[in-house]
Amino acid sequence: MNMKRVKLIVAYDGTNYCGWQVQINGITVEEVLNRTLSELCHEDIKVIGASRTDSGVHALGNVAVFDTESGIPGEKFSFALNQRLPEDIRIQESCQVADDFHPRYCDTIKTYEYKILNRRFDMPTERLYSTFVYYPLDVDKMKRAAAVLVGEHDFKSFCSSRSQVENTVRTITDITIDKVGDMIHIRISGNGFLYNMVRIIVGTLMKIGLGIWPEDCMESILEAKDRTKAGPKAEAKGLTLVEIKYL
């Protein structure tokens, strides 16, 4: 049989997973996909993911590829996998792609959304997919502060101190902040994100929204290139990888 490469669009509820990437500490999305594909194809399968989301982070449109000699057509893998995967992982789409397609080494725009429930008490139905903030957030201040981040900047202040990456320059193409009822939606798109970058941006915006920090502090935080100058890292559960668009 000839080897082929198949692309998957993967959605998952990250609540019960220790992130995407295989690790010894607990079950991960990548591990479940590897095991399920290996059983389906009767061969050893290892997927390559576009975004290695953290423990507790969700996804609507992560991308993964794998190579297989299976006779199953590329577009049929979504149905076949969804019959076997746990209910908190679903394949939105599958297709055969060029043998040299790599989900991490292409020009992309990634879009993340962070949800904040801003009201007097939490809601059980939202607790796994948003972070709860009791005190009122000033969304207009948050919008004005976020606008400073659009464009190409050195985001070292918004990168986890544990990260070993040398180049911390990234481009944010768009940030929108909308409040629908009691839920605040922060949507951020860009050509790549540093480790914990979105969650640190959100934590900083929450400080501004609460009036703890002035709304004009973003420029000085960027210029500092110092993680300690930005806000805390927001909880993982409020973050969802919405889409990865290949350019």
Show the residue positions of the predicted features:
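Structured-RNA-binding interfaces characteristic of tRNA pseudouridine synthases
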Residues: 1-247
